């Protein structure tokens, strides 16, 4: 499309220039006529000189002369040419400017000139590496990019300038006082909406984030300035979260970016973990709680690097499709002992049960509804023992095991990957009579060999139900980073959470309730701790699973249950009420599986998912059910099964039972109600 547009523009200017040349020559012949200039040589030289000067805005035959000529002219031809010439005097210099610009652009292809004239969105990127190159390559027309990196080579700097990107080759962390203020002016901080911290060092990214909280920069930056920070180190991430939470009322908006996490989220969005069951599922009119309880997940992860670990953590959130479906994850790696020890730091052993003898991690039904287990296998997949293992732990009908219904090969080595795929294909063919028309999703990492990746994509029949896990180039772009729909949904969930306090002191005040919803959503989000933000992002991501489960009966009754005169909650505009003002009566309704079957199942499902997610973030339960949440110790009394959570009890002093938190598990249904209401 751009090429066609450029061709049309070039043709337009060429025709305009040709017209200008023709008119200038015609007027030259009339003005420098043979009577006044009898010598042909000088006559032609005057005509050419006038033409050259006309294209430089200094024609010998000016407007004053033309006005006299037109006034005294008796010939229609001379009059028409005269008027055309007066117009061309202004057109010719423009043609010259376009021609000069085109030549410069072709010789020195620098595109940065246009930012002087166009109001563009200002984005500042700190660091320069392969990930930043991918981000920059996705820049849109009205985005002005600034790259800040002291280690840029001259060749890299020239290449960036040629592509219209502003370069700041300096170490900003050493700047102080006025120097820092001048740096802010150079990167146009006052007009900046997003700052991307993408250095490969998480510690350096943290230092830059801290720099923007200095007094010299705090007042200059926009109120809505947002930071995207690349951080794939859990320890550094916790430090940054603590720093943000400590200053959260004045801290800049912060979102962590992990490339392995982006890849896994993209994979699960296209190929959900429940595909094996949903591939033969027919949407029904009526709710059937028992059907979803059979949607067990048996996930095989081969290769336990960052990608494999991220998939396991995401499976703890996205694998929950009912309050009781079994989740079993088998992980295979040749260096399992070291990787398992590192991965175990994600969990708290007061909540998650570690069995070193069996190489297993389990969350028991006492801690959360349903069953969840991870089994680690230390082996080299090139050997026969891998084939034996597949048949032992993945055979249909095996005791507590069953067929693998989702497989991910997360190995970087291409030869090992292809060998593993061959074994998995044999395994699936062995049990094709059991699988039948169902789809066993097989994701494979192939970014190291694009040719092989394209072959797999084109020959999905040969490698049955195999798909390639998106490489970083496909999941990393400025558009997806800035316009993240998941983040928008997370803010809505966070707002719903804040409006369910009923008769609590922090319930929305009338003046707050009168504010526009978009304003309230942003205000509530800005003052939330990072762990609450992460929790809301997790529930927003899982919403796709719940939407798949919502049959027609559910959608038809949302208004009756949550509308202005709802049976469960009452919609009061920008906040919710429970007309009976009694938390225990609401819990009775949520537990009434006969009267409210799908509501009862959805709240249990959501509570189980929340428990697993919090466990993956290192949180633990506490023995004292009346104890307040302890953020520093990552302790929460609500991390228990539903029966324990919904226990009733009398207030003990200032403490109260955690049953009042059951209402928060209604949030996914309330979000769906709001979406339906908005349509």
List the model feature ranges, each with a label.
Residues 631-641:
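Short, flexible domain-boundary/linker segments around small modular repeats
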Residues 666-675:
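C-terminal, surface-exposed recognition/capping segments
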Residues 622-630:
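A glycine-biased, small/acidic residue-tolerant capping/turn segment at secondary-structure junctions
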Residues 26:
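ATP-hydrolysis module of ASCE/P-loop NTPase motor domains
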Residues 2-23, 33-46, 53, 59-610, ...:
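Cytosolic regulatory regions of ion transport systems
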